[in-house]
Amino acid sequence: MRRAGAACSAMDRLRLLLLLILGVSSGGAKETCSTGLYTHSGECCKACNLGEGVAQPCGANQTVCEPCLDNVTFSDVVSATEPCKPCTECLGLQSMSAPCVEADDAVCRCAYGYYQDEETGHCEACSVCEVGSGLVFSCQDKQNTVCEECPEGTYSDEANHVDPCLPCTVCEDTERQLRECTPWADAECEEIPGRWIPRSTPPEGSDSTAPSTQEPEVPPEQDLVPSTVADMVTTVMGSSQPVVTRGTTDNLIPVYCSILAAVVVGLVAYIAFKRWNSCKQNKQGANSRPVNQTPPPEGEKLHSDSGISVDSQSLHDQQTHTQTASGQALKGDGNLYSSLPLTKREEVEKLLNGDTWRHLAGELGYQPEHIDSFTHEACPVRALLASWGAQDSATLDALLAALRRIQRADIVESLCSESTATSPV
């Protein structure tokens, strides 16, 4: 009996030990479930990856995931319960700096010249540094413009939100200062007329036969011809007056100038003589022809003994064409926007990113309903500029003024630098 009881007790202990082992293994399996959720059958619910949302949560069945739609929905977490979330829309004065993709939401930022107020979340216009103050921190994202009063030695003569205080101009040794530098205006310098450099003065009472210590002042309107060879100052024996001899280059300059002048005068006289002789022959030929005979063309060539042929009519037409072309190049098409090169207009379209073109349209006189109609076009900026460019008042000056009013000085500088680079001299 005792042996049977002992055997039963051992069996009970073995069963209890097996139950404990199974319980521990079952609890450990549940602890390794990353989601902490289980199906009705005890299976760990799986999580949806980044870019996927839960279409059907687990319960009777396992979790069902679906991919998020680009530019429509996104999911930036790994979850067994979160569905795809709708993308954020950039509205009003906001522009998109990063698009909405499957795993990341869109990132919006305020348009150029605006920043996001942290308290209201709205886009506010950047503060302008007044005259006498300069930029310390630029206006961007959630940071408004930070200005400072220009310290000594710097100035700012323009109110904007992009330029810091500039260092004052320091006049050179050959200049004199007309106006001091102030926090709101730069210093103004003027060239001093050229003078001879004074030499050291010998002590009084000395018997030195050196020349005068101060060279005479040369009037500013007279040009001084620099010498490449140093002036040599000698003293004639028995005389206190110095003898100044110039270098060889100074002696040759008048000779070269005389030869050049003689060549120019001779060439002008030769051309004048040939023209006078040609006119005389033309008059004699015209008198010998009948009255009803057609006069000779103005383009008749004039031959000289040297073999040089001059076509007076061609020269006249060429000069007239050159003057006309120069006048048109200087005058342009009345500075119309449509006269800009295609590449320059495309550059303006690229710079008008985000919703900046809406503000430009308002400055150009378009109503809100007309501005909204441009959004239906494939490229609203190009449609706006094409519509405005067709008007008679669509001048480049009007466009530059509108760009300055919306604080787009970068586009103004681009247009002005291009116009300067291509303008005729």
Swiss-Prot record:
Compartment annotation: Cell membrane; Cytoplasm; Perikaryon; Cell projection, Growth cone
InterPro entries found in the cross-reference section: DEATH-like_dom_sf, Death_dom, Neurotrophin_rcpt-DD, TNFR/NGFR_Cys_rich_reg, TNFR16_TM, TNFR_16, TNFRSF16_N
Domain of life, source organism: Eukaryota
Keyword Hydrolase on entry: no
Effect of C257I: No effect on dimerization. Loss of dimerization
Region (Mediates interaction with KIDINS220): 327-342
Biased composition range(s): Polar residues: 206-215, 282-292, 306-327
Segments in the Extracellular topological domain: 30-253
One Gene Ontology MF term: preprotein binding
GO biological process terms, semicolon-separated: axon guidance; cellular response to amyloid-beta; cellular response to oxidative stress; central nervous system development; circadian regulation of gene expression; circadian rhythm; detection of temperature stimulus; dorsal aorta development
Swiss-Prot/TrEMBL keywords: Apoptosis, Biological rhythms, Cell membrane, Cell projection, Cytoplasm, Developmental protein, Differentiation, Disulfide bond, Glycoprotein, Membrane, Neurogenesis, Phosphoprotein, Receptor, Repeat, Signal, Synapse, Transmembrane, Transmembrane helix
Membrane topology per record: Single-pass type I membrane protein
Principal cellular location given in the protein's record: membrane
Post-translational modification: Subject to intramembrane proteolytic cleavage by the gamma-secretase complex, giving rise to an intracellular fragment that is rapidly degraded via the proteasome.
GO cellular component assignments: cell surface; cell-cell junction; clathrin-coated endocytic vesicle; cytoplasm; dendrite membrane; dendritic spine; external side of plasma membrane; growth cone
S-S bridge residues: C33-C44, C45-C58, C48-C65, C68-C84, C87-C100, C90-C108, C110-C123, C126-C139, C129-C147, C150-C165, C168-C181, C171-C189
Record text about domains: Death domain is responsible for interaction with RANBP9. It also mediates interaction with ARHGDIA and RIPK2.
UniProt function note: Low affinity receptor which can bind to NGF, BDNF, NTF3, and NTF4. Forms a heterodimeric receptor with SORCS2 that binds the precursor forms of NGF, BDNF and NTF3 with high affinity, and has much lower affinity for mature NGF and BDNF. In response to proNGF binding, the heterodimeric receptor with SORCS2 activates a signaling cascade that leads to decreased Rac activity, reorganization of the actin cytoskeleton and neuronal growth cone collapse. Plays an important role in differentiation and survival of specific neuronal populations during development.
Subunit field text: Homodimer; disulfide-linked. Heterodimer with SORCS2. The extracellular domains of the heterodimer bind NGF. The cytoplasmic region of the heterodimer binds TRIO. NGF binding mediates dissociation of TRIO from the receptor complex. Interacts with RTN4R. Interacts with TRAF2, TRAF4 and TRAF6. Interacts with PTPN13 and RANBP9. Interacts through TRAF6 with SQSTM1 which bridges NGFR to NTRK1. Interacts with BEX1. Interacts with BEX3. Interacts with KIDINS220 and NTRK1. Can form a ternary complex with NTRK1 and KIDINS220 and this complex is affected by the expression levels of KIDINS220.
Record protein name field: Tumor necrosis factor receptor superfamily member 16
Gene: Ngfr
